[in-house]
């Protein structure tokens, strides 16, 4: 089946899509000086996600981890602690899941341009841009929330993607694991798929004639 919609560029989210590994609050707790009890690990995890949106919008590493530490009743982390925290948090972005890599490879082989549209702190974005996988598979725009100061599902970040793509919305496809982010893309006439797993998305792409 041919791609009757003439898709030219496919944008992917990263976390929860290409990279399934999640941050490890147990490791964060250890670095900032808490024990590995369930209570402490849960406290750190809640603090991390309470400030994540602001971090994704461009908050500095120090500001973010100071906010997390403060929520845990701790003083500002040292420069060394911040470095370790950032490394622990961002290191998972060095590689994508193997099945996701095969999907990107197949799409590139089929002639599609691939881009990224993701909520992500600046340090993580740097890791992605310098990664082997991004240099190998991503030949379209890479839109990071921290670079534009806007997070999904705000329509502004999708407009940034449209401007960078230099294509009409009907030439694009967006894939994300969050239904509200998929809906936000569709409101701007960008076709979008909800990522449940790589096999399901492959089937969706086959139905669209893309694979």
Segments from the language model and where they lie:
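Asp-based, Mg2+/Mn2+-dependent phosphohydrolase catalytic module
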Residues: 1-12, 117, 121-122, 126-211
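Active-site neighborhood of HAD-like aspartate-dependent phosphohydrolases
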Residues: 2-46, 187
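Short histidine/acidic/glycine/proline-rich micro-motifs that form metal-
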Residues: 15-18, 51, 88-92, 121-122, ...
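Hydrophobic alpha-helical core bundles mediating ligand binding, dimerization, or RNAP-core interactions
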Residues: 25-28, 48, 65-69, 86-90, ...
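Alpha-helical elements of Rossmann-like donor-binding domains used by nucleotide-donor carbohydrate transfer enzymes
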Residues: 26-27, 50, 63, 67, ...
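Short, surface-exposed acidic
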Residues: 33-46, 73-86, 169, 210-211
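A metal-dependent, Asp-based hydrolase signature
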Residues: 52-85
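Short, acidic loop-to-helix structural element flanking the phosphoryl-transfer center
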Residues: 80, 84-114, 155
């Amino acid at each position: 089946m041919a791609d009757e919609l003439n898709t030219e560029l496919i944008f992917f989210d990263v976390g929860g899509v290409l990279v399934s590994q999640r941050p490890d609050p147990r490791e964060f707790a250890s670095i900032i000086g808490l024990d590995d009890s369930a209570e402490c690990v849960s406290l750190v995890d809640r603090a991390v996600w309470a400030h994540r949106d602001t971090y994704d919008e461009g908050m500095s590493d120090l500001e973010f981890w100071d906010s997390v530490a403060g929520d845990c009743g701790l003083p500002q982390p040292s420069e060394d602690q911040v470095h370790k925290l950032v490394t622990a948090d961002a290191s998972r972005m060095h590689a994508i899941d193997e099945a996701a890599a095969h999907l990107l490879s197949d799409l590139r082989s089929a002639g599609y341009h691939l881009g990224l549209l993701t909520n992500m702190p600046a340090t993580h974005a740097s890791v992605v841009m310098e990664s082997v996988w991004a240099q190998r598979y991503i030949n379209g725009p890479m839109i990071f929330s921290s670079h534009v100061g806007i997070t999904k599902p705000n329509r502004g970040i999708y407009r940034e993607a449209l401007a960078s793509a230099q294509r009409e919305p009907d030439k694009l496809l967006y894939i994300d694991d969050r239904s509200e982010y998929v809906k936000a893309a569709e409101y701007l006439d960008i076709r979008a798929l909800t990522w449940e797993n790589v096999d399901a998305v492959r089937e969706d792409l086959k139905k669209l004639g893309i694979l």
